[in-house]
């Protein structure tokens, strides 16, 4: 989870 709504990566967001 980095930042913001990362729609290209469900697990990261």
UniProtKB/Swiss-Prot annotation:
One of its GO terms (cellular component) is extracellular region. Expressed by the venom gland. Keywords: Disulfide bond, Glycoprotein, Hemostasis impairing toxin, Platelet aggregation activating toxin, Secreted, Toxin. It is found in: Secreted. May be glycosylated. GO terms for molecular function: toxin activity. Residues 11-13 form the C-type lectin domain. The keyword Transmembrane helix does not apply. Negative results: does not agglutinate fixed platelets. Heterodimer of subunits alpha and beta; disulfide-linked. Binds to the platelet and collagen receptor glycoprotein VI (GP6) and activates platelet aggregation. Belongs to the snaclec family. This is Snaclec ophioluxin subunit beta. It comes from Ophiophagus hannah.
């Amino acid at each position: 989870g980095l930042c913001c709504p990362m729609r290209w990566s469900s697990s990261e967001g």
